[in-house]
UniProtKB/Swiss-Prot annotation:
This is Transcriptional repressor NrdR. Keywords: ATP-binding, DNA-binding, Metal-binding, Nucleotide-binding, Repressor, Transcription, Transcription regulation, Zinc, Zinc-finger. GO terms for biological process: negative regulation of DNA-templated transcription. Its cofactor is Zn(2+). It comes from the Bacteria. A zinc finger (unnamed) spans 3-34. GO terms for molecular function: ATP binding; DNA binding; zinc ion binding. PANTHER family: TRANSCRIPTIONAL REPRESSOR NRDR (PTHR30455:SF2). Belongs to the NrdR family. Residues 49-139 form the ATP-cone domain. Coiled coil: none annotated. Pfam families: ATP-cone (PF03477), Zn_ribbon_NrdR (PF22811). Negatively regulates transcription of bacterial ribonucleotide reductase nrd genes and operons by binding to NrdR-boxes.
């Protein structure tokens, strides 16, 4: 790191500690030439996660949209807001950990459905009815039959 006082490029780290709830690191450094101390901050470069919509347009990932969809699916169900927040955080972390900068709405929908299926089957069916755009009662019933078959297998 270049010393802000003398411009020398060698220094030693005197102290290092996490800040901003672990999202950055504060370092105290000492220049090996002029012995003056200075502080630097390191932060992970966060690249925005882009969502590819069905019409091929792109927009930044929006966790509020995800949360609103879950709230609608879980309306009047015994699922706490806390549980939904954890699910949103988990899904967002899963998407970021995939190391892909772009993700499709299909991928997000499949992740949400797999998590809802284990949490609450009614919420799962509600979400699936919007996500899969059931055109009539038969496609809706097919999804219910599939869910019941999977339940029997388990």
């Amino acid at each position: 790191m270049k010393c802000p006082f003398c411009g020398f490029i060698e220094d030693k780290v005197i102290d290092s500690r996490p800040t901003d709830e672990g999202s950055s690191i504060r370092r105290r450094r000492e220049c090996t030439k002029c012995s003056r101390r200075f502080t630097t901050y390191e932060k992970v470069e966060s690249l925005p996660l882009m969502v590819i919509k069905k019409d091929k347009s792109r927009q930044p990932f929006n966790r509020e949209k995800l949360m609103n969809g879950l709230l609608r699916a879980c309306e009047k169900r015994p699922i706490s807001i806390n549980d939904l927040e954890k699910m949103v955080e988990n899904i967002e972390a899963q998407l970021h950990n995939s190391l892909q900068r772009e993700v499709t709405t299909v991928d997000i929908g499949e992740i949400v459905m797999s998590k809802l299926k284990t949490m609450d089957e009614v919420a799962y069916v509600r979400f699936a009815s919007v996500y899969r755009q059931f055109k009539d009662i038969n496609t809706f019933m097919d999804e219910l039959r599939k869910l019941l078959r999977e339940e029997k297998i388990e």
